[in-house]
Design a protein with these regions (language model features):
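N-terminal amphipathic alpha-helix/helix-capping segment at the start of soluble metabolic enzymes
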Residues: 1-27
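Catalytic cores of large soluble enzymes that bind and process phosphate-bearing ligands
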Residues: 7, 63-70, 239, 243-246
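Alpha/beta enzyme core
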Residues: 12, 27, 31-60, 64, ...
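Short clusters of hydrophobic/aromatic residues that line enzyme substrate/ligand-binding pockets
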Residues: 15, 159, 240
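Short, solvent-exposed beta-strand edge segments and adjacent coil->beta transition regions
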Residues: 23-25, 115, 237
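A hydrophobic, small-residue-rich beta->alpha segment in the mid-to-C-terminal subdomain
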Residues: 229-249
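Conserved small/polar residues in nucleotide/adenosyl-binding loops
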Residues: 250-257
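Hydrophobic alpha-helical segments, chiefly the membrane-spanning helices
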Residues: 262-264
Length: 264
């Protein structure tokens, strides 16, 4: 069995240094204290306490019903025992409709939910909100491509940015978010070539989910990785548990795989 990676405290500066060095960032969603301990022991660099919990924990069809109370509760679960991995907490649907509302809710996610930074969905249309949060010392992670909170508007779970106009718009989104002060970017379900272009065009680290191997890091939904999500999984998801004996060894395998870029 591989040795457990040496634990270290991960900060935004750490992630920036990893990008500069070409070292891949290992990220998973996490929602509770027990998995936090196991994942940190496996050397995961960052957690996204995602509104995906609405689907994998609460049984909803989308992330839309997730509330601020949900995000604070699960963020605090992770923060209570987390010591090393950077914690990114999602801002749920309609919690950042305007800059002042976003500021109040983001402050709660940090103060009550233990977030190191908050994540919100959208691109150029959210630049003013990002700028407002950053001006109040709240670190922001952007999220472009497939936006689960806008799934009805997007017409389902489909790859975004396939055509030239869509690709240009996503590149402009990434650049606008960085200009507004975002320091991390999640890119979901976009073509690998586009993700590589965006990654090389911005200085902030990029985290891909279904966005090819050339992002600065990869993230998967924990329950997808363990193969316990019902229904059909996205094609980019690999079940790491099926070939291992324990959950902790599964996480070590996933960590090593992200480092070697053998899935994405």
């Amino acid at each position: 069995m591989p040795e457990t990676p040496q634990l270290k405290s991960v900060t935004l500066r750490t992630l920036q240094q990893m990008k500069s060095a070409g070292e891949k960032i290992a990220c998973l969603t996490c929602y509770d204290a027990s998995f936090t301990r196991v994942l940190e022991a496996a050397g995961v660099d960052m957690f996204i306490i995602g509104d995906s919990l609405g689907m994998v924990l609460k049984g909803h069809e989308t992330t839309v019903p997730v509330t601020m109370a949900d995000m604070i509760y699960h963020g605090a679960n992770v923060a209570r025992v987390g010591q090393h991995a950077l914690r990114v907490v999602d801002m749920p649907y309609m919690s950042y409709a305007n800059p002042e509302q976003a500021l109040g809710n983001a402050a709660r996610l940090i103060a009550e939910g233990g977030a190191d930074m908050v994540k919100l969905e959208g691109g150029q249309d959210k630049a003013d909100i990002v700028r407002h949060l950053v001006s109040h010392d709240i670190p922001v992670c952007g999220h472009i491509g497939l936006l689960p909170q806008s799934i009805e508007e997007l017409g389902g779970y489909h790859v975004q940015g396939r055509d030239e106009a869509g690709a240009r718009a996503l590149l402009a989104d990434a650049q606008a978010l960085e200009a507004a002060g975002a320091t991390l970017l999640v890119m979901e379900c976009i073509p690998a070539e586009l993700a590589a272009l965006i990654t090389s065009s911005v200085s902030m680290p990029t985290i891909g989910i279904g966005a090819g191997p050339d992002c600065d890091g990869q993230v998967l939904v924990l329950y997808d990785m363990l193969g316990i999500t019902p229904g059909r999984l996205p094609r980019f998801v690999r079940n790491f548990l099926q070939d291992t004996d324990t959950v902790s060894y599964t996480h070590l395998r996933a960590h090593e795989t992200v480092r070697s870029i053998s899935y994405a």
